[in-house]
Amino acid sequence: MSLAKDHQGSATSSGKAPVYQVLAEDIRAMGIEAAFGLMSDDTALLATALDTAGVRFYGARHENTAITMAEGYAYTTGRIGVAVVGRGPALANGLHGAVYASRTGSPVLLIYGEAATSGRPNGLGPDYKAIDGVGVLRSAGLHTFTATSPQSARMALADAVANAAGGAAVSLHLPTNVQLAEIDRPREPLQVRHLERTPAPATTQSIEAATAVLTKASRPLILAGLGAHRAGARNAIQTLAEKIGALLVTTARGKDLFCGNPYNLGIIGSFSHSIARRMAEQADCVLVFGASLNFLTTSFGTSLPRVPLIQVDAVRSNISRWLNADVALVGDARLVAEQLLAALPARSETKPFHDEATRRLISGFDPARDFQAANTARTLDPRTLAIELEELLPRDRHLVVDSGNFLSVVPYLSVPDPGCFKMTADFASIGLGFGAALGVAKARPEKTTVLVIGDGGFLMTMGELETVVREDLPMVIVLMNDCAYGAELHFLRLRQQPVAKSVFPDVDFAPIAEGFGFEAATIRTLEDLHKVAPRLRKPDGPIFLDCKINADVAAPFMSEFAHFEGRH
């Protein structure tokens, strides 16, 4: 670990100023340029001061969205995402997003308007907004910091920022009386020192152990996740795969990392195509870089063969979290790949996976022929829809997906690299995608952000249509509307239970989106989609597609979960 360079806080000047103003200036001087929130009486002054100081305040229509906006911004930029929410009911509204943010590993600073430290906040009686904000946010997984006095407020901010910068969600609690108190303007900039992880290689002993296993393998499979992308390991891993004759697969979060490689099988697990599954089953060793091997990557333990497993991760606790690794390599993905390249002997030309037949099989694969399309007169198979959208949407895009049964579309929509793809399933819930997409769109306005969301998650966050138009965000919203809670529908159906309560009327959302200022269309057939193709290729303003999809199409993980449940 090495010390990162100090951040410096607000410019100094003479006189006094309220704490909220000093903190706003400190935050801007740290290089933070955006904050997301929904004003409350205990945060309105701070939000206004932030905006005045040059930290653009983006107002959301719900606290849950404000927090997920900050997380989406942080995920995309690698910089601290700031959310500002009030206490009591505002925190209750935002708790869903707070738990989610704490599980993503993104650097998020949640500034919380806390009750006054003494007396009755309203001066009249019981505080109707009373809630244990510190206790609630700690239980949500956040590290909490409180400004207990006007004099300690700047140090509390410095500590919170330092912890967030390390890849954590933290909360800074600012009691109203502390915010309003006047203090001397600082004579010195605020110093924020934080530890920055220095990429480290694996130990010699672990490299030797991995080399011994790989040398014996004739059909190795290399699996890479988002961690490999963030480590910049793509080229080193591809060179290693060429040396040892390995096929390449990724997790869903690492999708398209090896796009263009002749031995790339795409995603492994619940989002695999048939060739990937068939080829992966033939592997006699699996080498994993920067992936947790969760239940979607392993299809509940069925997608990877029972062969020696070598797992590489920069964080020791991530190894063997889901599957037991035979060899653990604790180190940076790129450095470890380079170590293995140097340690492994040159292999003969006999590489069973690297032959002309394999290359032809992979290059000739047509995803549209990998399933029986289930289009009807008034609905589309979501997979067919996604294959068409792949050709119509701008290539240089960010893709954000909410959660739900419609996630079967993930393998059919590509991105330039894994950093342009954002899943929001870290809390296994729906309703988080819209906020994350707003944050991504703000972070990267030069690209079109495509949000794919189900009707259930959309209805939870529909008010943010106004935010998209107000902030002029470059977005295309693809509503996968099966008129149902699709995951629950198939959960019930797979257990031979009645599904009526999971199904809803067919509502046309396009006119609603038009009322907010979107270009909108209802899509029931491919002909409907082709009519809007010119606008999709070069969007000029936000676009909303209410895509009516066939609710009978189940995502693969629905049946996988049912089978897993049956075995246990």
What are the language-model segments listed below?
Residues 75, 93, 226-310, 416-447, ...:
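Glycine-rich, anion-gripping cofactor-binding loops and their flanking helix/strand elements
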Residues 107, 118-129, 320-322, 328-330, ...:
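Thiamine diphosphate
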Residues 14-15, 131, 159-216, 370:
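Conformationally flexible catalytic loops at phosphate/diphosphate-handling active centers
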Residues 3-7, 112-156, 174, 253-357:
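Glycine-rich, acidic loop regions that bind phosphate or pyrophosphate groups
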Residues 33-36, 56-58, 76-113, 223-226, ...:
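A short, small-residue-rich loop immediately preceding and capping a beta-strand
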Residues 22-33, 72-78, 161-166, 206-220, ...:
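Glycine-rich phosphate/diphosphate-binding loops that line cofactor/substrate pockets in enzymes
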Residues 20-24, 28-31, 38-41, 45-51, ...:
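Active-site diphosphate/adenylate-binding microenvironment
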Residues 2-15, 148-151, 171-174, 186, ...:
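Phosphate/pyrophosphate-binding active-site segments
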